[in-house]
């Protein structure tokens, strides 16, 4: 089966670091692009999961916790957005997946990248890791995957 046409091509998405009229969508995009997080993982991030001093984020998925290293640029971006219990919340409750996808879609459209999605941004994360000579096992661990099976197509 043929993968998407974007597979294998590393995109220049440096414009994502520029200011945006959709700051939440921008931060969602950066968390996926920089750390390979899933929208569901992003929506469950509590402010207490972020350790700004150590630039790490604790992510929980299916009862498994993992620690994600944050870049100093991303840590700075996160520090500007924290206020309540969750990173993205309304009245103390996390926003819905639909909200996250609308924010991401609006941001990607603003940056002229309407053809991208959460999945294609996660793929960009994987491609960047491979470019940096990281092993599939390390990438799988960082993504919270139990095995490298879903990453085999990148060999």
In which residue ranges do the predicted regions lie?
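Conserved tyrosine-mediated DNA breakage-rejoining catalytic core shared by Y-recombinases
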Residues: 35, 44-76
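Short, basic interhelical loop/turn and adjoining N-cap
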Residues: 49, 94-98, 145-153
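Short functional hotspots where side chains directly engage DNA or cofactors
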Residues: 55-59, 128, 137-155
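Active-site/catalytic core of tyrosine-dependent DNA strand-transfer enzymes
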Residues: 71-114
């Amino acid at each position: 089966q043929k993968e998407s046409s974007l597979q294998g091509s590393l995109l220049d998405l440096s414009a994502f670091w520029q200011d945006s009229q959709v700051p939440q969508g921008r931060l969602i995009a950066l968390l996926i692009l920089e750390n390979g997080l899933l929208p569901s993982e992003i929506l469950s991030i509590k402010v207490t999961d972020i350790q700004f001093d150590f630039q790490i984020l604790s992510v929980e998925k299916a009862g498994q916790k993992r620690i994600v290293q944050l870049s100093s640029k991303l840590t700075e971006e996160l520090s500007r957005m924290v206020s309540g219990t969750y990173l993205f919340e309304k009245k103390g409750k996390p926003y819905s997946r639909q909200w996250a996808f609308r924010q991401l879609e609006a941001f990607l459209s603003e940056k002229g990248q309407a053809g991208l999605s959460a999945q294609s941004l996660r793929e960009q994360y994987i491609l960047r890791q491979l470019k940096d000579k990281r092993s599939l096992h390390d990438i799988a661990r960082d993504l919270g995957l139990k095995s490298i099976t879903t990453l085999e197509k990148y060999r």
